[in-house]
Curated annotation (Swiss-Prot):
Gene3D superfamilies: 3.30.70.330. Residues 169-249 form the RRM Nup35-type domain. It comes from Mus musculus (Mouse). Pfam families: RRM_Nup35 (PF05172). This is Nucleoporin NUP35. The modification Phosphothreonine is found at T106, T128, T264, T265, T272, T274, T279, T307. Residues 65-92 are annotated as: Disordered. One of its GO terms (molecular function) is structural constituent of nuclear pore. PROSITE patterns: RRM_NUP35.
Length: 325
């Protein structure tokens, strides 16, 4: 029977890693846990590679793997990056204070802190950063934001809404018609008179819009449904609810002061309503009501003529007495 002697200098199984460069497993102490550290979410200890004297054909392989060794620079210790322990069991209480923000903070915590800082200073991003000055400096927080008016804000319909508040109640019977040339104002007014009884209309002296007041809200909604309609194959008209409080207040004040100026124009008897006396604009065009009346009326009123009457003077009586006339 042959006896095998064990060489005491020979490396035992498990003392040397299988491949070069693989990290060795950490040694467990006397009070080690039952589960290994990577299952509990612990970070592995940084491993510093130790230089070894290797001769033979494996030297070229090592030089191809690590070109830094050939340059002569000292090897840098491998520091593992922090990973989120979302899949590992908890290792501390949720009420414990985190002392190190780099190791204890998660991406969710850092994202929440960034959102809180942006909410606390909303005017930081509005100012233009100066070269050499931080955007999050306290000097930029108190500066007012400089806004540039857009083309929509320069529009008169947009600026009229700046004076409105949440407590204001607008009259739903008023609509604003815009987008027509000045020469076609009467034509557009005649077209919108077909959608309801127009109580009053106010035209702009220099602009391309007019405010129309209907008798009921239903008629105003019918006019609002014509927004974007093309009239005369060349005029696209826009219709919006009126937000000009001055026009509404002046109209109500004029009705209360002089009720005779409030002129109601039914479409069955009059095609184009005449302007009230409170309107400052003087119309130079011929009213269309005359031609419309003549074409729709069934009866024509003849003006009174000069009819002969009996002379009751003294001379006529004397002649009648003498000659028997």
């Amino acid at each position: 029977m042959a006896a095998f002697a064990v060489d005491p200098q020979a490396p035992t199984l498990g003392s040397e890693p299988m491949m070069l460069g693989s990290p060795t497993s950490p040694k467990t102490g006397a009070n080690a846990q039952f589960l290994p550290g990577f299952l509990m979410g612990d970070l592995p200890a940084p491993v510093t590679p130790q230089p070894r004297s290797i001769s033979g054909p494996s030297v070229g392989v090592m030089e191809m793997r690590s070109p830094l060794l050939a340059g002569g620079s000292p090897p840098q210790p491998v520091v593992p990056a922090h990973k989120d322990k979302s899949g590992a069991p908890p290792v501390r209480s949720i009420y414990d204070d985190i002392s190190s923000p780099g190791l204890g903070s998660t991406p969710l915590t850092s994202r929440r802190q960034a959102n809180i800082s942006l909410l606390q200073s909303p005017l930081v991003g509005a100012t233009t950063p100066v070269p050499g000055q931080s955007m999050f400096s306290p000097a930029n927080i108190g500066q007012p934001r400089k806004t540039t008016l857009s083309p929509a804000q320069l529009d008169p319909f947009y600026t009229q809404g700046d004076s409105l508040t949440s407590e204001d109640h607008l009259d739903d019977t008023w609509v604003t018609v815009f987008g027509f040339p000045q020469a076609s104002a009467s034509y557009i007014l005649l077209q919108f008179a077909q959608y309801g009884n127009i109580l009053k209309h106010v035209m702009s002296n220099t602009g391309n819009w007019m405010h129309i007041r209907y008798q009921s809200k239903l008629q105003a909604r019918k006019a609002l449904s014509k927004d974007g309609r093309i009239f005369g194959e060349s005029i696209m008209i826009g219709v919006k609810p009126c937000i000009d409080k001055n026009v509404m207040e002046n109209s109500d004040r004029g009705v209360l002061s002089s009720p005779s100026l409030a002129f109601t124009t039914p479409i069955r008897t009059l095609g184009t309503p005449t302007q009230s006396g409170s309107t400052p604009r003087v119309s130079t065009m011929r009213p269309l009501a005359t031609a419309y009346k003549a074409s729709t009326s069934d009866y024509q009123v003849i003006s009174d003529r000069q009819t002969p009457k009996k002379d009751e003077s003294l001379v006529s009586r004397a002649m009648e007495y003498m000659f028997g006339w």
